Amino acid sequence: MILTQLPAEFQAAKPIIETIEAAGYEAYFVGGCVRDTILGKPLHDVDIATSAFPAEVKQLFKRTVDTGIEHGTVMILDHGNGYETTTFRTESGYQDFRRPDQVTFVRSLKEDLKRRDFTINALAMTANGEVIDLFDGLADMEQGILRAVGVAEERFHEDALRMMRAVRFASQLGFTIESQTEQAIADNAALLAKIAVERTRVEWEKLLMGQHPVAGLTGLLTTDLYRYMPAMADQEAMLRQLMALPAWHLPSIESTWTLLSWTMQRTDEAAVRQLLKTWKTSNELINHVTAAIKALMALKHNGQLTAQENFYTGLEALKTANQVATILGFGQDQAQLVQSYASLPIHDKHELAINGGDLLKAKLVTPGPMMGQILAACLQAVVMKQVPNQQDALLDFARMVADSKNH
């Protein structure tokens, strides 16, 4: 196969390959960028593999960075964008099922490609667009099949995360996992527990945000791989619930975890926090999801949100909640929801026209819990449009609240 119309990303990187070839070495575009070009998908990274050893690559270019030189990877900066260029290599000794004990640089493209995970990722392409397919990846791609390169069990022992990558690709591409590859995942599923939670989480999120999530979830269930994911061992029913939803697509990591928390019935704040901490997500994501879940509960039970609920949820978490509510069948009109939020008198407590200093100055309170209570009452009154957000009006209101608390 020869690709005649190469995307601009390849055109920009061609001088790298041409420079390496002019010095007498081989160099190719490899992996996901070749796969995605053939499938007509947008490119993320352009990766180059070469027969030149790292020291030889560095001699050919003026600006390089050793991004992973022990594994043969050098970043070349000579042509604007940085391009990761990796020496052909073989790997051996995977005692931790994650990374090789030994990397050996070689001059053979075939030796390099045969250590890759799946046939559709074991493709190389020349600077002129000629695809080199040594493991029938093109035929598998045409048939929508995900097949391990060589012996599947060996590939999964080299890096157990490849099992998660298999179900993730099934979701993203809508491909079927080939039977021997699927059996090898089932036989070795327990190895996933040896993988860092953060690495598993990235694949899990990508699976759920794929265009064909049911294909990925089916793979998890068929192989029992889900049993070795954090907090998932007893979640078969939840996975089947997700699969039974009408066609759905999750647009963000935030909506992904909101849907998961909801479907796992983790709806109180402590349970949401515990789930997301188990998966080692950021505190920012935890705060977003807890706010979205509260809004989702209100949408489910009341069909709409009060001004106060809008205010405390915040616009981004509101959008997330409504995206998930739409998947679950009780979403609201998104534009209307955004408009309701926009019409709030204020959108942040710091916009309140008075603060503790103003209360002290007006001799309405002394420092202590009462000050916080009065400010909270003022905030609520402004959000509910009971009092305008003006200092004089709020001081009058604060005086009234203080009087009621003193009697």
Curated annotation (Swiss-Prot):
Homodimer. It comes from the Bacteria. GO terms for biological process: RNA repair; tRNA 3'-terminal CCA addition. Mg(2+) binds at residues 45, 47. It comes from Lactiplantibacillus plantarum (strain ATCC BAA-793 / NCIMB 8826 / WCFS1) (Lactobacillus plantarum). NCBIfam families: PRK13299.1 (NF009814). InterPro entries: Bact_CCA-adding_enz_type3_sf, CCA-adding_enz_C, CCA-adding_enz_firmicutes, NT_sf, PolA_pol_head_dom, PolyA_RNA-bd. Its cofactor is Mg(2+). The gene is cca. Its EC number is 2.7.7.72. HAMAP family: CCA_bact_type3. Pfam families: PolyA_pol, PolyA_pol_RNAbd, tRNA_NucTran2_2. Catalyzes the addition and repair of the essential 3'-terminal CCA sequence in tRNAs without using a nucleic acid template. Adds these three nucleotides in the order of C, C, and A to the tRNA nucleotide-73, using CTP and ATP as substrates and producing inorganic pyrophosphate. tRNA 3'-terminal CCA addition is required both for tRNA processing and repair. Also involved in tRNA surveillance by mediating tandem CCA addition to generate a CCACCA at the 3' terminus of unstable tRNAs. While stable tRNAs receive only 3'-terminal CCA, unstable tRNAs are marked with CCACCA and rapidly degraded. CTP binds at residues 32, 35, 116, 159, 162, 165, 168. The keyword Metal-binding applies. ATP binds at residues 32, 35, 116, 159, 162, 165, 168. CDD domains: NT_ClassII-CCAase. Keywords: ATP-binding, Magnesium, Metal-binding, Nucleotide-binding, Nucleotidyltransferase, RNA repair, RNA-binding, Transferase, tRNA processing. PANTHER family: CCA TRNA NUCLEOTIDYLTRANSFERASE 1, MITOCHONDRIAL (PTHR46173:SF1). It is an enzyme of class 2 (transferase). This is CCA-adding enzyme. Belongs to the tRNA nucleotidyltransferase/poly(A) polymerase family. Bacterial CCA-adding enzyme type 3 subfamily. A single active site specifically recognizes both ATP and CTP and is responsible for their addition. GO terms for molecular function: ATP binding; CCA tRNA nucleotidyltransferase activity; magnesium ion binding; tRNA binding. Coiled coil: none annotated.
